[in-house]
Amino acid sequence: MLSALARPAGAALRRSFSTSAQNNAKVAVLGASGGIGQPLSLLLKNSPLVSRLTLYDIAHTPGVAADLSHIETRATVKGYLGPEQLPDCLKGCDVVVIPAGVPRKPGMTRDDLFNTNATIVATLTAACAQHCPEAMICIISNPVNSTIPITAEVFKKHGVYNPNKIFGVTTLDIVRANAFVAELKDLDPARVNVPVIGGHAGKTIIPLISQCTPKVEFPQDQLTTLTGRIQEAGTEVVKAKAGAGSATLSMAYAGARFVFSLVDAMNGKEGVVECSFVKSQETDCPYFSTPLLLGKKGIEKNLGIGKVSPFEEKMIAEAIPELKASIKKGEEFVKNMK
């Protein structure tokens, strides 16, 4: 069922560069001057799906906007600087993407980012709740396992919460799983689709290799190694960059892919499926990432976990306590805010 609905990875990105796509989405990027924000803004500017691109950050946005505005594509670009300009950046937006926050450095986990990024996400999502309450909210800022509950609680506080419109962008886990499986099996990565469920940190990242299309088989030792590599791929990049940042280019690609899928669905395209960390009843965890059928109003249907192998079943059971703790941490943060 899922395999039939899921289009091959990257199809949305490729299609977004074709001229036949509808061209009307108003998209805001909050944290547009950062390591993810700049390449993400470039990919969004390059897409005919986007008609207006508004960029927000606390530094350098006028320069980033000026640079992007010289690109010969239809999207208009405007930069907004500092909290007093944030309301204007958000007005009339259909989609808001938030990569704002501090990146990981060697030796740090995504959870180490919590104290700084929790405040940033709470502040930015409060502005979204006030100035574009109907927009789709796509959170990239880590730790996603906590920043999505933060976003939900902030929207609840403002009385505008809609669980079908708040997404934790876990797409990079799927992109990596597709790339790594394709590499091992000598397949075209654009034709590989591996659902990745659970959360977006370490052991909570659960690639469902048993549901991969096309079907692939690995001996258990290779499967364990592959799963571990997908779970720790972010750390692999942090180490390789040796203190000069985290995964920015691949994250920008994954973020753009998710936005284009969402906009396609909002434009009425049928059968658009992406995994995302959202409010969920699929497990006893209040938030969980699974494949979602996207529609005009956000989540049309949660497609659930589906049939999993005993190895995957065990990973799900082990991930849930950690996920619950991260979720609670996010919820408590908002409850304790002044």
From Swiss-Prot:
Gene Ontology biological-process annotations: aerobic respiration; gluconeogenesis; malate metabolic process; malate-aspartate shuttle; tricarboxylic acid cycle
Record: residues binding substrate: R104, R110, N142, R176
Residue numbers binding NAD(+): G31, A32, S33, G34, G35, I36, G37, D57, N117, I140, S141, N142, M251
Alphabetized GO MF terms: L-malate dehydrogenase (NAD+) activity; protein homodimerization activity
Record PROSITE patterns: MDH (PS00068)
InterPro entries: L-lactate/malate_DH, Lactate/malate_DH_C, Lactate/malate_DH_N, Lactate_DH/Glyco_Ohase_4_C, Malate_DH_AS, Malate_DH_type1, NAD(P)-bd_dom_sf
Subcellular location: Mitochondrion matrix
Keywords: Acetylation, Glycoprotein, Mitochondrion, NAD, Oxidoreductase, Phosphoprotein, Transit peptide, Tricarboxylic acid cycle
The name this protein goes by in its record: Malate dehydrogenase, mitochondrial
Gene that this polypeptide is encoded by: MDH2
